[in-house]
């Protein structure tokens, strides 16, 4: 079975939007509800997409197990968005901070505590976060919903898009396909993180990923 090139699927949509924008003097871009996992991952995604969409970043990450870590990451997200808006990189970017509810993550993770990073627990975590994104995107009348998660080389972009497309059908709102790591997207995010001096964590967020990462460092 042929694999879907989600970057090319995204480019088709963006090219159509660009043509519409060039053809209309009073063009108003579509509204995108973009789930963001963290500022570093969002840096390239926002730079790339803010020329085509009115973006509202949805910061919803109940997988972050430690409240101090959560506060640090959400503060960096807000700081990056403020910097981008000040520089007028594209259309203005807004942000909605979701509830910090790690208990929902732990309830979801029951029975999957020993899954390796990148396994079924992670897939259930993607669904948890994207489900809330789709729900609020539909309620808010957005034109699309999406996530920054596909920028990571450690994340399964095909699985993320599969979940997003399923939720699109369930909630009746278009999913914006992506594989942001393509076309040097991940490399660009590292450069932007350095440029804006963003805090760049070395684990995804949950206590399980933190423990696995610490074990890797010890055994290196």
Predicted regions mapped to residue ranges:
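Nucleotide-activated chemistry modules centered on ATP-dependent adenylation/adenylyltransferase
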Residues: 1-44, 52-220
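Aromatic pocket-lining residues of Rossmann-like dinucleotide-binding sites
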Residues: 49
């Amino acid at each position: 079975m042929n694999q879907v090139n989600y970057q090319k699927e995204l480019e088709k949509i963006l090219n159509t939007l660009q043509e519409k924008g060039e053809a209309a003097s009073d063009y108003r871009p579509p509204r995108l509800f973009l789930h963001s996992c963290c500022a570093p991952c969002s840096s390239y995604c926002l730079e790339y997409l803010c020329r085509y969409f009115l973006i509202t970043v949805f910061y919803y990450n109940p997988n972050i197990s430690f409240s101090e870590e959560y506060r640090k990451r959400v503060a960096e997200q807000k700081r990056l968005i403020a910097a981008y808006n000040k520089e007028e990189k594209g259309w203005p970017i807004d942000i909605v901070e979701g509830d910090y509810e790690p208990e929902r993550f732990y309830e979801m993770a029951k029975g999957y505590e020993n899954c390796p990073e990148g396994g079924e627990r992670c897939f259930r975590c993607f669904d948890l976060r994207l489900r809330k994104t789709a729900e609020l995107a539909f309620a808010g009348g957005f034109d699309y919903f999406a996530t920054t998660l596909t920028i990571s080389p450690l994340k399964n972009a095909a699985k993320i898009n599969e979940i997003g497309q399923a939720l699109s059908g369930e909630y009746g709102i278009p999913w914006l396909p992506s594989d942001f790591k393509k076309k040097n997207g991940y490399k660009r995010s590292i450069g932007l993180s350095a440029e804006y001096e963003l805090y760049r964590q070395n684990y995804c967020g949950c206590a399980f990923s933190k423990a696995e990462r610490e074990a890797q460092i010890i055994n290196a």
